[in-house]
Regions:
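A short helix-loop-beta-strand connector motif used in the catalytic cores of GNAT acetyltransferases and
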Residues: 64-75, 104
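Conserved GNAT-fold acetyl-CoA-binding loop/helix
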Residues: 28, 39-62
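Conserved beta-strand-loop-alpha-helix junction that forms the acyl-donor binding cleft
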Residues: 140-150, 167-169
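Conserved beta-strand in the GNAT
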Residues: 74-76, 82-91, 109
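A short beta-loop-alpha structural element at the N-terminal edge
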Residues: 22-36
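Conserved acetyl-CoA-binding loop-helix of GNAT-fold acetyltransferases
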Residues: 107-110, 116-129, 152, 156
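A conserved beta-turn-beta hairpin within the catalytic core of GNAT-like acetyltransferases
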Residues: 94-105, 115, 161-162
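Conserved GNAT acetyl-CoA-binding A-motif
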Residues: 124, 131-143
Length: 170
């Protein structure tokens, strides 16, 4: 952790050329902006977003569950007093690999006007560093099959497509 800025613990700073961003732990006040990021892509547009007060309440309940559990970190990148990126990092204990602790990166989103400026790479690099710091043996992530550009991005950062994932909606 780098330090405090305005009462917020800064986890990392990112030089964006003409400006800078900080990576910090998400706070409840960030939930609407995070949901906007989730809903702003082709997949999230059909499953995320706040249309009613009940929708917002569901996201707030989820935020509180994540925030209360030390095995989960929800972080945001803030630039020019706006939330411009997010990701969730979860730590998963398991018996496989001699009881190795794994890190799972999920819900990576960077606002469109901040893509291509190094912010996504900085977020992932921070997540890898934090995973090492927590004693993880590996970092894993999933990405929808339709996200070919994201796959190339993750491969460029050293991730290897080793598994075929499956989901069952409940």
């Amino acid at each position: 952790m780098l330090g405090q800025t305005g009462g917020v613990t800064v986890l990392a700073t990112v030089d964006l050329g003409s400006s800078a961003a900080i990576i910090r732990r998400a706070e409840e006040r960030d939930v609407p902006a995070i949901v906007d990021l989730l809903a702003a892509d082709q997949l999230g547009a059909t499953r995320d977003g706040v249309r009613t007060a009940d929708d917002l309440a569901a996201y707030q309940r989820a935020f509180h569950a994540i925030d209360a559990d030390r095995a989960h970190l929800l972080v945001v990148a803030e630039a020019d007093a706006e939330i411009v990126a997010t990701l969730q990092l979860s730590f998963l204990p398991g018996l496989a690999r001699r009881g190795a602790l794994r890190a799972q990166i999920e819900a990576v989103r960077v606002r469109g006007d901040y893509r291509g400026r190094g912010l996504g790479e900085a977020l992932i690099t921070w997540a890898i560093h934090e995973s090492r710091r927590q004693g993880c043996a590996l970092v894993q992530l999933t990405s929808d099959k339709s996200r070919q550009a994201a796959h190339r991005f993750y491969e460029r950062l050293g991730f290897v497509a080793t598994h075929e994932g499956m989901k069952l909606a409940l």
